[in-house]
Amino acid sequence: MAAPLKIDYAFNAEDLESSAKIVKFTILKKHQEPDAAQEHELASFEETMLPHMDAAHNLAKWLLRNEEDAQDVVQEAYLRAFKSFSGFHGSNGRAWLLTIVRNTSYTLLKKNRAVDLTTTFEEEIHTSGHESVSPATILEHSENAELIKEAMDELPAEFREILTLRHQEGLSYKEIADIMQIPAGTVMSRLARARGKLKEYLAAHIGKER
């Protein structure tokens, strides 16, 4: 059996370094001659937040479905994160950053009115049996990479988002609930719906159930 496929839009190392430099340059530009305290804050911010730039880009890309918009959103989100960094006292920098990326992405989506941001399905459903569906079942083989991307593109933004957070980034239900600002039970039901719709699309286009 082929290895499970991790479908994402990850930056390569060169892109990551370039975007990190842009973020750092923009921040430094706001502090023409940063003092020791500002330099310490920037160093702490870089250490805590820059390792999550790939995850930030991945989420923005799936939500926006546009590379240029995704990069703009990531940079804007990092600048917002830096402005608020003095108030960050938690231990989960990735979840905190992804919350900002999510909010920034939805602000752009609403501005462009590019998609219907709400799902058309009832959230309160039974989820027994769905949780046994693993990422390997949904994102199965590399030869189906393009088809999986097409299937994801057909989903509402909220479904793309929850699949990305759970199966691409491996976040817990609690982390996803915090990021999406919904109850954990809604996370489970929405994830079950998203998996089901993804499997339906794949079954229809590949000709067999996943």
Locate each region found by the language model.
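Structural recognition of an alpha-helix C-terminal capping motif at a helix-to-coil junction
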Residues: 72-79, 83, 91-103
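Amphipathic, Lys/Arg- and hydrophobic-enriched alpha-helical face
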Residues: 48-67, 84, 152, 203-205
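A short pre-motif secondary-structure segment
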Residues: 162-166
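Arg/Lys-rich amphipathic alpha helix in sigma70-family domain 2
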Residues: 99-120, 141
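Residue-level preference for hydrophobic side chains embedded in well-ordered alpha helices
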Residues: 48, 52, 56, 77, ...
